Structures are given as C-alpha cells and as structure tokens.
Amino acid sequence: MPEAGAIRPDGTVLGFDVGSRRIGVAVGTALGAGARAVAVINVHANGPDWVALDRVYKQWRPDGLVVGDPLTLDDKDQPARKRAHAFGRQLRERYALPVVLIDERSSSVEAAQRFARERADGRKRRRDAEALDAMAAAVIVERWLAAPDQATSLP
C-alpha cells in the first residue's frame, strides 16, 4: 500500500468528514485556491454509497485521500474515530491511493460558522445546510494543505 508521505504536495486530494449518516467530501490542491466542498454521500446500514463515491473519485482523479481524525479534546479515542479509520482503510483498498488522517477537531464548528457568514451575506440559503458535512470536509483539506506534515498514517 502507498505510504502517507506519498501524496504529492502539488497533487489533488479528496478530503472526507466521516459521519454515521453522511460523509462530506471536498477537493483541494496546493496549486488552487484552497479546498471546495463537492458532495455529501449518504451512509446506509451496509455502509457508504460506493456508487456515489466512485463517481466523485472518477470526476476528480485525486493523488491522495485525507480523512478527518475525530479525536476528543483530550486526545482520547471514540466510536467515531474507529468508523473514520475503517472508512480510510476501505478507501485505501478500493482506490489504491495513499490515505492520511488529519485532526478534525472543531471542523464542523468552523464549517457552521462559515455557513452562517455565507448565509448572512446572501450566498447560502437555509436549504443549503445539508452541505455542512462537505464544508467540514473542506476545512479538513485546508488543514492538510496548510500543514501536510501534521498528517498521520492510517493504522
């Protein structure tokens, strides 16, 4: 399997905010203007909607994948972390790309604040709120772009 450091720093990455019902997806590149929310993928009883994920993968052809690592504020493990790590392993097996983890603490809060600002500016509507998961994924990608050395390898 590819190593964590194998993601080209100038390559395109897809980032994921993994939840129990939805997975936010964002794309980013160091050569572009940060990250952009691109999709919200539903998670069913038997796992994520792989058809939708395959479609996003084919559209963006990333060089690597960045999964949010949901640590608690005191660096403890939690069920959400096990889910995110399992999803990262599935991504690595399915797409044969390097997968890294990046601390996602407060990414959903930051995404909600961005959404509120964009809504106040008239750029978002209430019905766009379902895109919050994808906005959180964009925060995760931006964190990786800003400090790729802070990423950890998937166990």
UniProtKB/Swiss-Prot annotation:
Entry-linked SUPFAM superfamilies: Ribonuclease H-like
Annotated GO biological process: rRNA 5'-end processing
Any GO MF annotation of the entry: nuclease activity
InterPro entries for the chain: RNaseH-like_sf, YqgF, YqgF/RNaseH-like_dom, YqgF/RNaseH-like_dom_sf
Cellular component, GO annotation: cytosol
Cystines in this chain: none
Keyword field: Cytoplasm, Hydrolase, Nuclease, Ribosome biogenesis
CDD domains reported in the protein's UniProt record: YqgF
Pfam families in the record: RuvX
EC class name: hydrolase
Protein location: Cytoplasm
Similarity field: Belongs to the YqgF nuclease family.
Record's function text: Could be a nuclease involved in processing of the 5'-end of pre-16S rRNA.
Name of this protein: Putative pre-16S rRNA nuclease
Organism: Xanthomonas euvesicatoria pv. vesicatoria (strain 85-10)
Taxonomic placement: Bacteria, Pseudomonadati, Pseudomonadota, Gammaproteobacteria, Lysobacterales
